[in-house]
């Protein structure tokens, strides 16, 4: 459940906790709002992300959370080692696999130009593309790079299938024949925005592999953020919201590096606060810190949460704190770590520091052993939920409360 600290909702059928006031938020300019996102990391030490691409087209397949009358994309070179030269980009409606709907392909420009060079450490929005898209629609964003990219900025563990081509510019091709190779990651693309004045704003699901949907079915769009997005679509116009992914597998609050991404403290502004139209963030983060360092003191994690809350509130963004799931039986489970998890969860529930609390621990735990995930919700590794577990999490969130935080 979500518990809210807003006086305006005292009459609502949700428990009330104390919490900090959130500054007033300005409307997103021109009604742009994020519909899809993926947090990026540095290239791996080996493999495709390390070698990068030359004279190839990457076809990233993404799934919208809300629709809109036009769109724009954001390409990232945040973790590149040299300028990223993009020669051609197209966006189309995806039909099946790497195939796109005939006639739906649109050229994407940057400042009116077909090509763009993005300095290393930077990212770039495209111009608006007049392509109407629906909620829960698959898009194919095809990015052609002629020159060698060097190590690539990417999102590993996408839990979705994308593609890359044989040599050449195949960005505008509707056929899948030039895309024989599957990749289970998103390269370069880190955001898609749409114009939709009926959407109140965006909710960012920020965290580690559970926020990213590990344990859910590949290509099924059954992460908890997908389930939540489907629920909020049923709200009246003006109260609906998009749901954006800012989860990274193996990510930690306090430490960072490699394909686990920068620490939550380091990446929070880029991956959460800078999302277009963001109004609220659900923070589900800390499990990996505890697993790797069970000797941490609760105050170390609590201080990090407080810092994230301060950052969000300074930009008028509400923060929902999610309790950490039980993980007895997981590879790095320890009794010491479980005590730390319980201490942190008590603070999340009872401190009043968050604007609301999502008690995912209560949803997922075995009622007969609170250190263990309920078997019906366990993906099998005792750490990540399965599809049913993610659906249960999404179902536990009071969407009326969430809508209040987003639109209030």
Where do the protein language model's features map onto the residues?
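N-terminal secretory targeting modules
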Residues: 7-206, 216-218, 237, 405-407
